[in-house]
Regions:
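Long, terminal "pre-/pro-" and other extracytoplasmic accessory regions
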Residues: 1-188
Length: 188
């Protein structure tokens, strides 16, 4: 386990590009993932973050909205994805791929997953929220990653891609990807 001081140092390092200040320790979270909980101010606004006591991973981060959003949704979509990847990398989640994103109310939610041996690892998802107007990270949840991420032995697909294309109910399937998906909370 890391100390509260080490957790605060991790927080300071992750949010250094956002000019973090006024960090306050709130207490310890005792959920499924044991955390040190903090509030702070930054260029993004008033924020809350949880750092895992085991390993020092950023588990949860959220910023209260402070301004009206008015970015072009099309332009924001692509740049928000890039901002999400960059922030995830800054927080220690490297080599992540965008698997889904959406935009509403001036905020983008971007779902990122790691890849291993050409397979998308959906159980290890990290969700990042980006403010569209300035591409500022305002949220992150890595609880699934924290609980599931490990090196896996990826088996060959049970169903060949050509067979899978014939099974799906979509008329025009342009490509297929190998994916590891969660199955009933306890299997993949």
């Amino acid at each position: 386990e890391i100390s509260q001081d080490r957790a605060q140092a991790v927080l300071q390092e992750i949010f250094k590009p956002q000019h973090i200040r006024n960090v306050a320790f709130l207490g310890e979270g005792n959920g499924d993932i044991k955390t040190f909980d903090f509030t702070f101010e930054s260029d993004a606004g008033s924020s809350f973050a949880q750092i895992a006591r085991k390993g020092g991973m950023l588990v949860d981060y959220v910023t209260a909205p402070e301004q009206t959003q008015n970015a072009s949704a099309t332009e924001a979509h692509v740049t928000c994805q890039r901002a999400a990847i960059d922030f995830a990398s800054q927080a220690g989640f490297c080599d992540m791929q965008v698997v889904w994103s959406s935009s509403e109310g001036g905020e983008c939610v971007v779902n990122l997953v790691p890849m291993q041996d050409g397979a998308i690892l959906y159980p290890d998802i990290v969700k990042v929220k980006i403010r569209e107007s300035d591409r500022m990270p305002i949220g992150l949840n890595s609880s699934h990653y924290a609980m599931n991420h490990r090196t896996r032995h990826i088996l060959p697909p049970r169903v060949p891609q050509s067979v899978a294309r014939g099974i799906v109910s979509l008329d025009n399937v342009s490509q297929g990807r190998l994916a590891l998906i969660p199955l009933r909370e306890s299997a993949e």
